[in-house]
Protein backbone atom coordinates (compact mmCIF):
# COMPACT_ATOMS: atom_id res chain seq x y z
CA UNK A 1 0.00 0.00 0.00
CA UNK A 2 1.29 3.47 -0.88
CA UNK A 3 2.01 5.60 2.19
CA UNK A 4 0.52 9.06 2.63
CA UNK A 5 3.72 10.88 1.70
CA UNK A 6 4.25 8.93 -1.51
CA UNK A 7 0.61 9.49 -2.47
CA UNK A 8 0.84 13.24 -1.97
CA UNK A 9 4.05 13.39 -3.97
CA UNK A 10 2.50 11.38 -6.77
CA UNK A 11 -0.54 13.63 -6.97
CA UNK A 12 1.40 16.89 -6.89
CA UNK A 13 4.52 16.08 -8.84
CA UNK A 14 6.24 18.95 -10.65
CA UNK A 15 3.90 21.70 -9.40
CA UNK A 16 3.61 21.48 -5.60
CA UNK A 17 6.29 21.74 -2.95
CA UNK A 18 5.26 19.92 0.21
CA UNK A 19 7.24 19.22 3.37
CA UNK A 20 5.90 17.58 6.53
CA UNK A 21 5.60 19.46 9.80
CA UNK A 22 7.16 18.16 13.02
CA UNK A 23 3.89 16.49 14.02
CA UNK A 24 3.31 14.94 10.59
CA UNK A 25 6.84 13.50 10.51
CA UNK A 26 5.86 10.96 13.16
CA UNK A 27 3.19 9.40 10.93
CA UNK A 28 5.00 9.51 7.58
CA UNK A 29 7.13 6.76 6.14
CA UNK A 30 10.26 7.61 4.23
CA UNK A 31 9.98 7.59 0.46
CA UNK A 32 10.85 4.33 -1.23
CA UNK A 33 11.81 5.60 -4.68
CA UNK A 34 12.63 8.61 -6.85
CA UNK A 35 11.66 9.40 -10.44
CA UNK A 36 14.36 10.46 -12.89
CA UNK A 37 13.48 13.09 -15.47
CA UNK A 38 15.30 11.53 -18.41
CA UNK A 39 16.42 13.35 -21.53
CA UNK A 40 13.20 13.44 -23.54
CA UNK A 41 9.52 12.55 -23.22
CA UNK A 42 9.11 12.09 -26.98
CA UNK A 43 8.28 8.40 -27.54
CA UNK A 44 9.46 8.50 -31.16
CA UNK A 45 12.86 9.70 -29.99
CA UNK A 46 13.37 6.84 -27.50
CA UNK A 47 14.67 4.22 -30.01
CA UNK A 48 17.19 6.74 -31.35
CA UNK A 49 18.39 7.61 -27.84
CA UNK A 50 18.57 3.92 -26.96
CA UNK A 51 20.74 3.11 -29.98
CA UNK A 52 22.91 6.20 -29.52
CA UNK A 53 23.73 5.67 -25.85
CA UNK A 54 24.12 1.91 -26.18
CA UNK A 55 26.66 2.53 -28.97
CA UNK A 56 28.49 5.15 -26.90
CA UNK A 57 28.62 2.82 -23.91
CA UNK A 58 30.02 -0.05 -25.98
CA UNK A 59 32.64 2.24 -27.55
CA UNK A 60 33.62 3.46 -24.08
CA UNK A 61 33.94 -0.10 -22.77
CA UNK A 62 35.89 -1.41 -25.76
CA UNK A 63 38.19 1.61 -26.01
CA UNK A 64 39.16 1.75 -22.36
CA UNK A 65 39.43 -2.02 -21.94
CA UNK A 66 41.66 -2.10 -25.03
CA UNK A 67 43.96 0.46 -23.39
CA UNK A 68 44.10 -1.64 -20.20
CA UNK A 69 44.77 -4.85 -22.16
CA UNK A 70 47.44 -3.19 -24.31
CA UNK A 71 49.32 -1.71 -21.36
CA UNK A 72 49.17 -4.89 -19.28
CA UNK A 73 50.26 -7.20 -22.12
CA UNK A 74 53.14 -5.15 -23.56
CA UNK A 75 56.35 -4.92 -21.53
CA UNK A 76 57.39 -1.77 -23.43
CA UNK A 77 54.51 0.07 -21.73
CA UNK A 78 55.33 -0.99 -18.18
CA UNK A 79 56.22 2.54 -17.11
CA UNK A 80 54.65 4.99 -14.63
CA UNK A 81 52.86 7.00 -17.33
CA UNK A 82 51.07 3.98 -18.77
CA UNK A 83 50.44 2.53 -15.32
CA UNK A 84 48.45 5.66 -14.46
CA UNK A 85 46.79 5.59 -17.90
CA UNK A 86 45.50 2.03 -17.40
CA UNK A 87 44.12 2.99 -13.98
CA UNK A 88 42.47 6.06 -15.50
CA UNK A 89 40.84 3.85 -18.15
CA UNK A 90 39.53 1.53 -15.44
CA UNK A 91 38.13 4.54 -13.54
CA UNK A 92 36.51 5.85 -16.74
CA UNK A 93 34.78 2.52 -17.39
CA UNK A 94 33.51 2.45 -13.81
CA UNK A 95 32.44 6.11 -13.93
CA UNK A 96 30.37 5.59 -17.08
CA UNK A 97 28.95 2.28 -15.85
CA UNK A 98 27.57 4.06 -12.79
CA UNK A 99 24.99 6.05 -14.78
CA UNK A 100 24.75 4.95 -18.40
CA UNK A 101 23.45 1.35 -18.11
CA UNK A 102 20.59 2.52 -15.87
CA UNK A 103 19.68 5.24 -18.36
CA UNK A 104 19.74 2.76 -21.28
CA UNK A 105 17.43 0.38 -19.39
CA UNK A 106 15.10 3.26 -18.50
CA UNK A 107 14.84 4.28 -22.15
CA UNK A 108 14.07 0.73 -23.23
CA UNK A 109 11.53 -0.04 -20.47
CA UNK A 110 10.00 3.48 -20.24
CA UNK A 111 10.41 3.21 -16.47
CA UNK A 112 12.41 5.98 -14.82
CA UNK A 113 11.86 4.97 -11.20
CA UNK A 114 14.88 4.26 -9.01
CA UNK A 115 14.71 2.97 -5.46
CA UNK A 116 15.94 5.08 -2.55
CA UNK A 117 18.78 2.66 -1.84
CA UNK A 118 19.57 2.39 -5.55
CA UNK A 119 19.76 6.17 -5.79
CA UNK A 120 22.18 6.40 -2.86
CA UNK A 121 24.29 3.58 -4.31
CA UNK A 122 24.47 5.23 -7.72
CA UNK A 123 25.34 8.57 -6.15
CA UNK A 124 28.09 6.99 -4.01
CA UNK A 125 29.78 5.32 -6.97
CA UNK A 126 29.38 8.48 -9.07
CA UNK A 127 31.25 10.50 -6.43
CA UNK A 128 33.83 7.73 -5.93
CA UNK A 129 34.85 7.31 -9.56
CA UNK A 130 34.44 10.99 -10.44
CA UNK A 131 36.85 11.95 -7.65
CA UNK A 132 39.17 9.08 -8.61
CA UNK A 133 39.31 10.37 -12.19
CA UNK A 134 40.28 13.80 -10.92
CA UNK A 135 43.00 12.52 -8.58
CA UNK A 136 44.49 10.18 -11.19
CA UNK A 137 44.77 13.09 -13.63
CA UNK A 138 46.68 14.94 -10.90
CA UNK A 139 49.02 11.98 -10.38
CA UNK A 140 49.63 11.87 -14.14
CA UNK A 141 50.44 15.59 -14.13
CA UNK A 142 52.99 14.98 -11.37
CA UNK A 143 54.48 12.15 -13.42
CA UNK A 144 54.93 14.50 -16.41
CA UNK A 145 56.41 17.15 -14.12
CA UNK A 146 59.07 14.73 -12.86
CA UNK A 147 59.79 13.41 -16.38
CA UNK A 148 60.40 16.89 -17.83
CA UNK A 149 61.79 18.85 -14.88
CA UNK A 150 63.87 16.04 -13.32
CA UNK A 151 64.62 13.63 -16.20
CA UNK A 152 67.86 12.27 -14.67
CA UNK A 153 66.08 11.25 -11.47
CA UNK A 154 62.83 10.10 -13.09
CA UNK A 155 63.34 6.36 -12.61
CA UNK A 156 64.44 6.87 -9.02
CA UNK A 157 61.55 9.19 -8.06
CA UNK A 158 58.75 7.47 -9.99
CA UNK A 159 59.53 3.99 -8.70
CA UNK A 160 56.83 1.27 -8.64
CA UNK A 161 56.31 1.74 -4.91
CA UNK A 162 55.51 5.46 -5.27
CA UNK A 163 53.24 4.84 -8.28
CA UNK A 164 51.29 2.21 -6.37
CA UNK A 165 51.10 4.50 -3.34
CA UNK A 166 49.72 7.39 -5.44
CA UNK A 167 46.98 5.17 -6.88
CA UNK A 168 46.20 3.73 -3.44
CA UNK A 169 45.93 7.22 -1.91
CA UNK A 170 43.71 8.32 -4.80
CA UNK A 171 41.33 5.42 -4.14
CA UNK A 172 41.44 6.04 -0.38
CA UNK A 173 40.67 9.77 -0.72
CA UNK A 174 37.89 9.02 -3.22
CA UNK A 175 36.31 6.54 -0.79
CA UNK A 176 36.51 9.15 1.97
CA UNK A 177 34.85 11.79 -0.22
CA UNK A 178 32.13 9.37 -1.30
CA UNK A 179 31.34 8.27 2.26
CA UNK A 180 31.43 11.84 3.56
CA UNK A 181 28.94 12.82 0.89
CA UNK A 182 26.80 9.80 1.72
CA UNK A 183 26.70 10.73 5.39
CA UNK A 184 25.30 14.14 4.44
CA UNK A 185 22.56 12.75 2.20
CA UNK A 186 21.54 10.06 4.72
CA UNK A 187 20.60 12.83 7.14
CA UNK A 188 18.01 14.12 4.66
CA UNK A 189 14.84 12.35 5.78
CA UNK A 190 12.16 14.15 3.76
CA UNK A 191 12.13 15.68 0.30
CA UNK A 192 10.00 18.30 -1.45
CA UNK A 193 9.46 16.02 -4.42
CA UNK A 194 10.35 12.56 -5.68
CA UNK A 195 11.23 13.95 -9.13
CA UNK A 196 14.96 14.34 -9.80
CA UNK A 197 15.65 16.75 -12.66
CA UNK A 198 18.39 14.60 -14.13
CA UNK A 199 18.96 11.24 -15.84
CA UNK A 200 20.80 9.94 -12.76
CA UNK A 201 20.88 10.64 -9.02
CA UNK A 202 22.88 13.83 -9.14
CA UNK A 203 24.10 14.82 -5.63
CA UNK A 204 23.23 18.50 -6.04
CA UNK A 205 19.68 17.63 -7.12
CA UNK A 206 19.05 15.63 -3.95
CA UNK A 207 20.23 18.52 -1.80
CA UNK A 208 17.91 20.88 -3.70
CA UNK A 209 14.97 18.57 -2.93
CA UNK A 210 15.71 18.37 0.79
CA UNK A 211 13.09 19.73 3.20
CA UNK A 212 15.52 20.31 6.06
CA UNK A 213 17.89 23.23 6.47
CA UNK A 214 20.87 22.43 4.28
CA UNK A 215 23.26 25.16 5.49
CA UNK A 216 25.52 22.71 7.32
CA UNK A 217 25.18 20.20 4.51
CA UNK A 218 26.22 22.83 1.97
CA UNK A 219 29.34 23.60 4.01
CA UNK A 220 30.25 19.91 3.96
CA UNK A 221 29.53 19.79 0.22
CA UNK A 222 31.86 22.74 -0.41
CA UNK A 223 34.51 20.90 1.59
CA UNK A 224 33.94 17.79 -0.54
CA UNK A 225 34.17 19.92 -3.68
CA UNK A 226 37.47 21.38 -2.50
CA UNK A 227 38.93 17.89 -2.00
CA UNK A 228 37.65 16.40 -5.24
CA UNK A 229 37.95 19.48 -7.45
CA UNK A 230 39.98 22.45 -6.24
CA UNK A 231 42.97 20.57 -4.80
CA UNK A 232 43.48 18.33 -7.89
CA UNK A 233 43.14 21.31 -10.24
CA UNK A 234 45.65 23.26 -8.14
CA UNK A 235 48.09 20.35 -8.32
CA UNK A 236 47.69 20.12 -12.09
CA UNK A 237 48.16 23.87 -12.56
CA UNK A 238 51.27 23.87 -10.38
CA UNK A 239 52.75 20.90 -12.27
CA UNK A 240 52.16 22.49 -15.65
CA UNK A 241 53.48 25.85 -14.45
CA UNK A 242 56.75 24.12 -13.60
CA UNK A 243 56.65 22.12 -16.85
CA UNK A 244 56.13 25.19 -19.05
CA UNK A 245 58.84 27.11 -17.18
CA UNK A 246 61.26 24.23 -17.70
CA UNK A 247 60.39 23.84 -21.39
CA UNK A 248 60.85 27.54 -22.12
CA UNK A 249 64.40 27.32 -20.76
CA UNK A 250 65.30 24.58 -23.24
CA UNK A 251 67.65 25.87 -25.95
CA UNK A 252 66.61 23.69 -28.91
CA UNK A 253 63.18 23.94 -30.62
CA UNK A 254 63.25 20.16 -31.14
CA UNK A 255 63.60 19.57 -27.42
CA UNK A 256 60.73 21.95 -26.68
CA UNK A 257 58.46 20.19 -29.19
CA UNK A 258 59.31 16.74 -27.84
CA UNK A 259 58.64 17.86 -24.26
CA UNK A 260 55.33 19.47 -25.19
CA UNK A 261 54.28 16.40 -27.20
CA UNK A 262 54.70 14.13 -24.16
CA UNK A 263 52.16 16.29 -22.30
CA UNK A 264 49.75 16.85 -25.20
CA UNK A 265 47.46 13.87 -24.60
CA UNK A 266 47.24 14.39 -20.85
CA UNK A 267 46.62 18.12 -21.23
CA UNK A 268 43.85 17.41 -23.77
CA UNK A 269 42.13 15.00 -21.37
CA UNK A 270 42.47 17.47 -18.47
CA UNK A 271 40.93 20.29 -20.53
CA UNK A 272 38.14 18.00 -21.72
CA UNK A 273 37.33 16.67 -18.24
CA UNK A 274 37.45 19.93 -16.29
CA UNK A 275 36.35 22.15 -19.16
CA UNK A 276 33.14 20.21 -19.77
CA UNK A 277 32.46 19.96 -16.04
CA UNK A 278 32.86 23.72 -15.63
CA UNK A 279 30.76 24.32 -18.74
CA UNK A 280 27.93 22.19 -17.37
CA UNK A 281 28.08 24.01 -14.03
CA UNK A 282 27.95 27.45 -15.68
CA UNK A 283 25.21 26.45 -18.12
CA UNK A 284 23.05 25.04 -15.32
CA UNK A 285 23.53 28.26 -13.36
CA UNK A 286 22.42 30.40 -16.32
CA UNK A 287 19.76 28.14 -17.86
CA UNK A 288 16.38 27.78 -16.17
CA UNK A 289 15.70 24.46 -17.90
CA UNK A 290 16.74 21.41 -15.83
CA UNK A 291 16.56 19.22 -18.93
CA UNK A 292 19.13 21.36 -20.76
CA UNK A 293 21.45 20.95 -17.79
CA UNK A 294 20.93 17.17 -17.87
CA UNK A 295 21.69 17.04 -21.59
CA UNK A 296 24.82 19.16 -21.10
CA UNK A 297 26.08 16.87 -18.33
CA UNK A 298 26.23 13.99 -20.84
CA UNK A 299 29.43 15.56 -22.13
CA UNK A 300 31.49 14.87 -19.01
CA UNK A 301 29.67 11.74 -17.83
CA UNK A 302 29.57 9.94 -21.19
CA UNK A 303 31.50 11.71 -23.95
CA UNK A 304 34.72 12.40 -22.02
CA UNK A 305 35.32 8.77 -20.90
CA UNK A 306 34.51 7.65 -24.45
CA UNK A 307 37.04 10.02 -26.07
CA UNK A 308 39.93 9.48 -23.64
CA UNK A 309 41.22 6.25 -25.28
CA UNK A 310 41.14 7.89 -28.72
CA UNK A 311 43.02 10.94 -27.47
CA UNK A 312 45.81 8.80 -26.00
CA UNK A 313 45.99 6.30 -28.86
CA UNK A 314 45.85 8.83 -31.70
CA UNK A 315 48.62 11.03 -30.27
CA UNK A 316 50.85 8.30 -28.85
CA UNK A 317 53.08 6.23 -31.11
CA UNK A 318 53.98 3.79 -28.31
CA UNK A 319 50.30 2.93 -27.79
CA UNK A 320 49.78 2.53 -31.54
CA UNK A 321 52.73 0.17 -31.92
CA UNK A 322 51.67 -1.84 -28.86
CA UNK A 323 48.14 -2.17 -30.24
CA UNK A 324 49.49 -3.45 -33.57
CA UNK A 325 51.65 -6.00 -31.74
CA UNK A 326 48.64 -7.10 -29.71
CA UNK A 327 46.53 -7.37 -32.87
CA UNK A 328 49.16 -9.51 -34.61
CA UNK A 329 49.35 -11.82 -31.59
CA UNK A 330 45.57 -12.18 -31.55
CA UNK A 331 45.29 -12.85 -35.28
Swiss-Prot record:
Cellular compartment(s):
Cell membrane
- Tell me the Gene Ontology biological-process terms attached to this UniProt entry: G protein-coupled receptor signaling pathway; sensory perception of smell
Stretches assigned to the Cytoplasmic side:
69-80, 141-164, 240-266, 315-331
Instruction: Show the coiled coil region(s).
Output: none
GO CC, alphabetical: membrane; plasma membrane
Q: Which InterPro entries match?
A: GPCR_Rhodpsn, GPCR_Rhodpsn_7TM, Olfact_rcpt
- Entry-linked PANTHER family: OLFACTORY RECEPTOR
Protein purpose: Odorant receptor.
User: Which family does the entry's similarity section mention?
Assistant: Belongs to the G-protein coupled receptor 1 family.
The name under which this protein is listed is Olfactory receptor 7E178
Originating species: Mus musculus (Mouse)
Which gene codes for it? Or7e178
Amino acid sequence: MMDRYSFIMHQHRDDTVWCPSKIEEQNITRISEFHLMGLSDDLQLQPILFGLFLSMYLVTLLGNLLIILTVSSDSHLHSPMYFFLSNLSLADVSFTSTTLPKMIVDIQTHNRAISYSGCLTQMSFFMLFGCLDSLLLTAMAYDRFVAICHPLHYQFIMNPRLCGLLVFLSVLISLFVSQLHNSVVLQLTYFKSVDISHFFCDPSQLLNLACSDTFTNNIVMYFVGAISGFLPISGIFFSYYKIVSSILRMPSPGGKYKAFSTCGSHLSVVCLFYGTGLGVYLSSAVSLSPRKGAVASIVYTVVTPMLNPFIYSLRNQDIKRAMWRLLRKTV
